[in-house]
């Protein structure tokens, strides 16, 4: 099955409070995935599969991959309708584009939290660029399993945001523009992209938080090793981060 998502990350921005929160879901999370949808975005048929297959069921980047992935994430986070979750926008980028983006901005520095073959040892400060980004964001065997990989993906996004601030949004966007137009897809308008660039320019990185949704190891009837979400933990997380407890 082609077009499976290596990274699925929800970015929630509060423009009033000037905060940003990243929610990651491991790609092996076992969920209900839409197989077909009508033109209004209603699910017609579904199946249980890894969450990273939703993009593929939608036909990938040139069809409705993003639409299916967004709907799958909405339904997963809603816990069968317990919460009203609406994801408005998406940005998807081909893995080759991610490699090139790393070089477009001159690489980014990260501190290794564990040894990763081809990247560095625990405690090392390493520049992530085209030569080692694949190992850094995709390796899991011997490098902290799926959760270790997700943590590194979040660290990479935070390092990119830091580098963009240091470069200045105008220089950074100019450097990345060619790669973005070639490899990325989004339903954000140009004005919205510019607004986000302005937000990042003045954003305090101390207000960027992250969380990884966890699950329990589970083996499917077909023998696949996957994760089943801890629904009580997910419920608590949704209430804490997305709902006003005083309302």
Question: PLM features: what roles do these ranges have?
Answer:
Residues 1-247:
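Non-catalytic, solvent-exposed segments at the cell envelope interface
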